[in-house]
Structure formats: structure tokens, C-alpha cells
Curated annotation (Swiss-Prot):
PROSITE patterns: RIBOSOMAL_S8 (PS00053). Its main location: plastid. It comes from Tupiella akineta. Belongs to the universal ribosomal protein uS8 family. GO terms for cellular component: chloroplast; ribonucleoprotein complex; ribosome. This is Small ribosomal subunit protein uS8c. It is found in: Plastid, Chloroplast. HAMAP family: Ribosomal_uS8_B.
Length: 131
């Protein structure tokens, strides 16, 4: 039984990049779907689809750069987990690599990036950082 589906998804993506897989399958939950859509919108992964053989899986196609297949994501880091939650208002959201990376937040207006949260002037729980 997986209790933290976000950490499981991030770990599966990280491990798939390490062994240079083209696709990775993760649990199909609302929060995983929204985070993977943000990763696609920000250009870190190629595509997100529902798995054809199972309705409980998301199929994420990973993005590689250049002929040497360099990963599209350098680092994925879980910031808040079930045992220790981190919250921030919109003024105190930490920048990742001086704005080069992205922090994903869970706010009262849904899951969004740090830039969207600052623009909407809304804070929330810091879920993960990507660069």
C-alpha cells in the first residue's frame, strides 16, 4: 500500500531517468495527474496519458535532450511529506535556482507553480521542487 503517492511518482520518474526509460507508469490520482500536467506544461516531460491497459495508471513519456539522452529533469525533490508539512505565503515561496526551477504548491485554488501562486497572491503547501 502506497501512502504518499506524490513521493512515489517523483521517485518513479527519477529512477526511470537514471536508467533512461522512455515511459514510466504511476498511480492515477487527481494530484498526480495535476502535477504531471504541470510538468508537461513547464516542458520537463513529453506527454501524459491514461494507460490503455489499466485505468489506474498514468503513462508519462519522459523528455531527453540532445543525442546523448540527457534527462529533461536534473533534480526532483519532495519538500513536504505526510509527517512534516511545509506551508508558505506567496511572499515567502523559496525560489529554485534563482527562478530557473519550479516549486509546485497545493493552494486553496488548486495545484499550481510558484509563479502562478505569486501572480494570484495565494500561498499553500510546498509539495516539490523541480529543476
Amino acid at each position: 500500500m502506497i501512502y504518499d503517492t506524490i513521493s512515489d511518482m517523483l521517485t518513479r520518474i527519477r529512477n526511470a531517468y537514471l536508467v533512461k526509460h522512455e515511459t514510466v507508469y504511476v498511480l492515477n490520482t487527481k494530484i498526480n495527474r495535476k502535477i504531471s500536467e504541470i510538468l508537461k506544461k513547464e516542458g520537463y516531460i513529453e506527454s501524459v496519458n491514461l494507460s490503455t491497459n489499466s485505468l489506474q495508471k498514468l503513462e508519462i513519456t519522459l523528455k531527453y535532450l540532445g543525442n546523448q539522452k540527457k534527462p529533461g529533469i536534473t533534480n526532483l525533490k519532495r519538500l513536504s511529506w505526510p509527517g512534516l508539512r511545509f506551508y508558505s505565503n506567496y511572499k515567502d515561496i523559496p525560489p529554485v535556482l534563482n527562478g530557473m526551477g519550479v516549486v509546485i504548491l497545493s493552494t486553496s485554488k488548486g495545484i499550481m507553480t510558484d509563479r502562478e501562486a505569486r501572480a494570484n497572491k495565494v500561498g499553500g503547501e510546498l509539495l516539490c521542487s523541480i529543476w
